[in-house]
C-alpha cells in the first residue's frame, strides 16, 4: 500500500487581509527566498518544485552543456572585446561549436568529438578554421581553469587546417594607372587614392576626418586617430584603433595632397569620405561605392532569369573594352580584380620596392608585429630568381676558391 505523503505544518501569515502559509528555502545563490500559498498542500508542491529547480540549476553549474558554457564564455568576453568582435565570436560559436556539440555536457566531450566538429571546417578557409579552433580551445581551457573538467579534450588538437587563402598580389604600376583612369570622377576615387598613396586600412579611411588631414604644412600628412566599424549596418566611429601601432602620422605624396585639396574645397562634411548627408558611410553604402569598380571589371558574373516559372542560371564573362548592354556608359576596362585591402598591400609593396627601410614601412603601415612587414619584404626582395642568381653564385662559389683548391 502506497505510503501517504506527509504535509508539513507551515507558519501562517496575513498579507493584505488574506491568510497565507509561508516557508523559506535557499536559492541557487544561497539567498533565502519566501514561498506563499493559501493551503499547506499547495505550498508543499511549490516547495518541492522550487527545490527541484534549485538542484537543476546547481547541477548545470557544475555540469554545463557545451551550449550553456559557450554562452557564459561569450558574456565573460563582452567586457574585453568590441561589439563587432563579440558578434563574430557568437556567430562562429553558434554555427560551428554549438550546432554539432551544444547538447553534450562539457565533461562528456572527447577529442574525437572536437575533431569531428572541425571536419566541415576543413573545406572552409584557413582563417575561419583557425578562428573556430581558437574559440573551442578558449572555451575548454576556461572550463578547465574553473575546475569543471578533469581532462581537457583540446590538449592534442592540431591548430592547422582549412584551405589556405590565395594571397592577393600587389597591383602593378600599369594596373594602378588603369584603375585610376577608370574610376576618375566616380565615388570610389578618393578612397582608392587614400589606399594607394597613404596605405590606410578601410576602417581608417572611412573614419578619416578633415581635422586629421594636414595639407597647409611644408610636408602634408594624414594623422590616423579614428576607426570605422559597422553595427547593424550603421557606422560607428571610435578612437579605439586596431592596435597601438595603428596610431600614426603618414606623410603623403603630392598627387594625394592635390586630390585631397580638391575634395576639401567642395566638401560640406567633417568626414573626408561621406554620404550625401555628410555622415560616414554605412556598410551597405560602402559596398555600393565599391560596386562602381566591380561592374567595370571582366570578372565572371552569374545571373538568374525566370523562364516559364523556372529559375535559369546564366554565366556571363564580359569582354575587355566592351560596354554593358543595359548601360553603355559602363565600359569593361579592368581585366584584374581589386579589393580594398589590395590597395594598402600595393602601398606597402611599393615602399619596399623603393628601398624604404622595413622598420619605417612597419611604422607607416601601422603594423604592430614586424613579422607582417617582413613577410611582405621577403616576398618583394626574394621572389625573383634572376635577380638572386649573382648573389647565390657568389655565396656558393666565392672568388678564388677554385684556384686555392687547385693549388
Q: Over which residues does each language-model region extend?
A:
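DNA breakage-rejoining catalytic core of tyrosine-based enzymes
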Residues: 107-108, 149-151, 162-181, 223-225, ...
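Short, Arg/Lys-rich segments that mark the N-terminal edge of DNA/RNA- and chromatin-recognition modules
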Residues: 1-38
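Basic, Lys/Arg- and aromatic-enriched nucleic-acid-binding interface segment
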Residues: 126, 130-132, 145, 149-151, ...
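N-terminal core-binding DNA-recognition domain of tyrosine site-specific recombinases/integrases
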Residues: 33-35, 62, 74-148, 165-167, ...
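Short, charged hinge/linker segments at domain and secondary-structure junctions
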Residues: 108-111, 141-163, 314-326, 390
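C-terminal secondary-structure termini that scaffold catalytic or DNA-interacting sites
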Residues: 1-2, 217-218, 230-232, 236-247, ...
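Catalytic-site neighborhood detector that most strongly recognizes the C-terminal catalytic loop/helix
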Residues: 170, 365-390
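Short, basic (Lys/Arg/His-rich) helix/loop patches that form interaction surfaces
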Residues: 126, 181, 185, 198, ...
Amino acid at each position: 500500500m502506497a505510503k501517504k505523503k506527509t504535509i508539513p505544518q507551515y507558519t501562517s501569515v496575513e498579507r493584505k487581509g488574506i491568510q497565507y502559509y509561508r516557508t523559506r528555502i535557499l536559492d541557487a545563490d544561497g539567498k533565502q527566498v519566501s514561498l506563499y500559498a493559501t493551503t499547506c498542500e499547495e505550498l508543499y508542491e511549490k516547495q518541492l518544485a522550487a527545490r527541484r529547480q534549485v538542484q537543476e540549476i546547481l547541477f548545470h553549474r557544475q555540469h554545463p552543456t557545451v551550449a550553456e558554457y559557450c554562452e557564459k564564455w561569450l558574456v565573460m568576453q563582452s567586457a574585453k572585446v568590441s561589439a563587432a568582435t563579440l558578434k563574430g565570436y557568437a556567430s562562429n560559436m553558434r554555427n560551428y561549436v554549438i550546432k554539432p556539440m551544444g547538447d553534450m555536457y562539457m565533461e562528456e566531450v572527447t577529442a574525437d568529438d572536437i575533431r569531428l566538429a572541425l571536419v566541415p571546417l576543413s573545406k572552409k578557409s584557413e582563417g575561419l578554421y583557425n578562428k573556430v579552433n581558437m574559440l573551442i580551445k578558449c572555451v575548454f581551457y576556461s572550463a578547465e581553469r574553473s575546475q569543471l573538467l578533469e581532462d581537457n579534450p583540446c590538449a592534442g588538437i592540431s591548430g592547422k587546417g582549412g584551405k589556405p587563402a590565395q594571397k592577393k598580389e600587389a597591383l602593378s604600376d600599369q594596373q594602378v594607372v588603369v584603375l585610376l583612369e577608370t574610376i576618375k570622377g566616380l565615388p570610389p576615387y578618393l578612397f582608392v587614392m587614400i589606399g594607394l598613396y597613404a596605405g590606410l586600412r578601410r576602417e581608417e579611411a572611412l573614419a578619416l576626418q578633415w581635422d586629421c588631414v594636414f595639407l597647409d604644412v611644408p610636408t602634408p600628412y594624414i594623422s590616423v586617430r579614428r576607426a570605422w566599424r559597422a553595427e547593424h549596418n550603421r557606422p560607428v566611429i571610435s578612437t579605439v584603433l586596431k592596435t597601438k601601432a595603428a596610431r600614426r602620422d603618414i606623410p603623403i605624396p603630392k598627387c594625394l595632397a592635390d586630390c585631397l585639396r580638391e575634395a576639401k574645397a567642395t566638401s560640406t562634411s567633417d568626414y573626408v569620405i561621406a554620404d550625401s548627408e555628410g555622415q560616414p558611410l554605412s556598410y551597405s553604402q560602402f559596398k555600393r561605392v565599391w560596386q562602381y569598380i566591380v561592374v567595370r571589371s571582366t570578372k565572371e558574373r552569374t545571373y538568374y532569369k525566370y523562364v516559364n516559372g523556372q529559375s535559369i542560371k546564366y554565366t556571363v564573362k564580359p569582354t575587355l573594352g566592351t560596354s554593358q548592354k543595359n548601360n553603355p556608359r559602363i565600359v569593361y576596362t579592368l581585366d584584374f580584380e581589386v579589393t580594398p585591402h589590395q590597395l594598402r598591400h600595393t602601398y606597402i609593396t611599393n615602399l619596399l620596392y623603393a628601398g624604404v627601410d622595413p622598420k619605417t614601412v612597419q611604422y607607416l603601415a601601422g603594423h604592430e608585429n614586424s613579422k607582417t612587414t617582413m613577410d611582405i619584404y621577403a616576398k618583394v626582395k626574394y621572389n625573383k630568381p634572376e635577380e638572386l642568381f649573382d648573389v647565390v653564385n657568389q655565396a656558393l662559389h666565392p672568388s678564388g676558391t677554385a684556384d686555392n683548391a687547385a693549388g
